[in-house]
Design a protein with these regions (language model features):
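Trp/Phe/Arg-rich N-terminal binding region typifying the photolyase-homology
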Residues: 2-4, 16-187, 348, 394, ...
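A broad detector of short, well-ordered amphipathic alpha-helices
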Residues: 43, 138, 344, 362, ...
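Active-site-proximal binding-pocket segments
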Residues: 258-438
Length: 485
């Protein structure tokens, strides 16, 4: 067996002296790259190995209740995507083996059981992922097995887009300008059409196996498909991508309109049912939409460079803000019962579908932090537990952006008025009436002015405002100024 090696296929470099020799048995670990098309790590493994075994590992720290950020919607979507992936691999003559346990223990077990010569996977960049992959590397080194990694998840690898001082950008615009310059953008590969033809399977019984059917019932409270916005899997992803290409031609003009459909691709990108390169290619002329992909890269860079943002403000002085946590107000916010229609519509959409329009995410987040004066960390965790497309880097980045504590964040004194947001982005209250049926027969002007008009609709079962916005805005400014004056 060969010695342990780490490589990045983005640079097509492998420092191992024996890499010209064909590897007999390879093991590819799927994570959030659940497709066999344009999967860099998988294609790398296929090109280097005679036989390629494929696996997925459910880990207790991610899919059980010990994970306080676990989303049942995300886990369900992931398992559906794994079912689709399993079918695709079976059609190619292979088998997707699924396990439950610690990554290093499962890898050690399989190296012995299948006589594995090299382990392949696509790199991830969160603190958890980095430690996980280190543990696999240690096992592989002890067993004299290669580890070969690839960069697949982002347009450009986190940590590679640097400023003139060779440091990570903390502002989006200079990051974006640099990343989209020829010097960097030339490294964005086109999607690959190569096929994997050497999937393998075994007749051996492998320990710690867990079927996807069992995983679905064991690790999730299943949300009926009729309620969710998107279903998992490559086939569903392709349909959504084709629909998005047709519907998003005017994205720059409509993306903030709460009643207009968005791309609905975020979960497919998160779990790799689509490659980021496929999405980039089809929308390459849609500058505003592509810009959103770069925000995703930006937040991945921030988390990679500043891992302390998970659990702490990126800007340390924001840790001194004295939040006014009101448990009852927080409960009303989570249930969509604050008496602020534009806020409640967003939260009800999230609770029902596992998804929320991006503009609604900003509105609801701002309301929690700068109107209810509740810490962004509570909102970050609640969103994480509900979102199908939950991504730690993006979710954390967006919440800290709203709070003012993150990279390139809005200033603390910028506070969204729910009424003005309603006027600007749902003037006819179509979005609100979709998610708050109690208001379906109420005039739009009364909904927009619900803070005063609710007294004229006492027969309506919808909540009256739990607080006075103007008063809370004043308190928010005092709360922040106590730290920053």
């Amino acid at each position: 067996m060969a010695t342990n090696t780490n490589t990045n296929t983005n640079t097509n470099e492998n420092t191992n002296k024996n890499t010209n020799n064909k590897i007999e048995n390879g093991l590819f670990i799927f994570r959030r790259d659940l497709r066999i098309i344009d999967n860099k790590g998988l294609l790398e493994a296929s090109s280097k190995c005679s036989k390629l075994f494929t696996i997925f590992i459910f880990t207790p720290e991610q899919v059980t209740s010990t994970n306080k950020f676990k989303s049942d919607n995300a886990v369900q979507f992931m398992i559906e995507s794994l079912q689709d992936l399993s079918t695709a691999i079976s059609k190619k003559g292979g088998h997707l083996y699924t396990f439950y346990g610690k990554n290093d223990a499962i890898v050690k077990q399989l190296v012995l059981a299948l006589d594995i010569d090299a382990v392949f996977f696509n790199k991830d960049y969160s603190p958890y992922a980095i430690e996980r992959d280190k543990s696999i590397g240690k096992v592989a080194e002890k067993m004299d097995v290669q580890v070969i990694t690839s960069q697949d998840y982002y347009l450009l690898e986190p940590g590679t887009v640097l400023n003139g001082s060779k440091k990570m950008y903390q502002k989006f615009t200079p990051f974006y300008n640099s990343a989209t310059s020829t010097a960097y953008s030339k490294h964005i590969d086109p999607p690959s059409s190569k096929q994997v033809t050497n999937f393998a399977k075994t007749t051996k019984t492998l320990a710690n196996g867990l079927s996807l059917v069992m995983a679905l019932t064991r690790f999730t409270t299943v949300n009926p498909k009729s309620d969710r916005l998107v279903d998992g899997g490559r086939q569903e992803a392709i349909i959504s991508l084709k629909t998005a290409v047709k519907s998003q031609s005017h994205y720059s003009k409509t993306h903030n309109d709460l009643f207009k459909a968005t791309t609905q691709l975020s979960a497919y990108i998160k779990f790799g049912c689509l490659s980021i390169r496929e999405v980039y290619k089809v929308f390459r002329n849609n500058t505003d939409l592509i810009r959103q992909l770069w925000w995703r890269d930006f937040y991945a860079n921030i988390l990679f460079a500043y891992p302390h943002v998970l659990g702490s403000a990126m800007k340390p002085n924001y840790n001194r803000v004295h939040w006014h946590h009101n448990a009852n107000w927080f409960k009303c916010w989570t249930k969509g019962e604050t008496g602020y229609p534009i806020v409640d519509a967003g939260m009800r959409q999230l609770n029902a579908t596992g998804y929320m329009h991006n503009r609604a995410r900003l509105i609801t987040a701002s309301f929690l932090v700068k109107t209810l004066l509740i810490s962004w960390e509570h909102g970050e965790q609640y969103f994480a537990k509900m979102l199908t497309d939950y991504d730690p880097a993006s979710n954390n980045g967006n919440w800290q952006w709203i709070a003012g504590s993150g990279a390139d964040s809005q200033p603390y004194f910028r506070i969204f008025s729910p009424k003005e947001q309603n006027k600007n982005f749902d003037p006819d209250c179509e979005y609100i009436k979709t998610w708050i049926p109690e208001l379906k027969d109420i005039l739009a002007k009364d909904i927009i002015n619900w803070d005063t008009e609710h007294v004229n609709h006492k027969d309506v079962s919808y909540a009256k405002p739990i607080c006075e916005f103007a008063k809370q805005k004043e308190l928010a400014l005092k709360m922040y100024e106590a730290v920053f004056r």
